[in-house]
Amino acid sequence: VEGVRKLEYGPPVTTMRNYLEQMGTAPYTAVREETDPLTLIAALGPKMLELAKTHTQGAHPYFTGPSHTKMARDILGEGPLLCVEQKVILETDADKARELARPIAKIYNRLPNYRNNWLRMGLTEDDIDNLSDRFIDETFAWGDADALRERINEHMQAGADHVCIQPINTNGNVGELDW
């Protein structure tokens, strides 16, 4: 953020709280809809989830598993929306599915906010650094359609209102689906 956009990176929760407060008081000059649009924020840790609870209509956690969904719902309570992201790979061969997942995971495994969250979820530094099978199995859903459906159901049973799936291409090309 600082290097590319020349923005000052501050404490995430304080920065987001200030942004939400400024957004709430900004003039709105377009034609109003009958209902105001919902505001959800990307939230992983307990403090950001608490901010989502108190200042928005919900949270959108990214790159997590059902155990995180349970924790997020416990913090949010019953009212706010919980719309989680789940990466899915339609591949039944465990070794192949995990190998397809690893290049995607490598994009994120050095970012402190994700690392901290995965540690909170019970993964180890070794799991994260080496993109272990345990890490992949916790953060990706892979298998046949029934296995993917089961993982989505695990999120729903853990308290998700909606599961946003992110298909990972089985041909290894990001952004291009082959199924």
How would you describe each model-predicted region?
Residues 1-179:
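Active-site-adjacent structural elements that line small-molecule/cofactor binding pockets in enzymes
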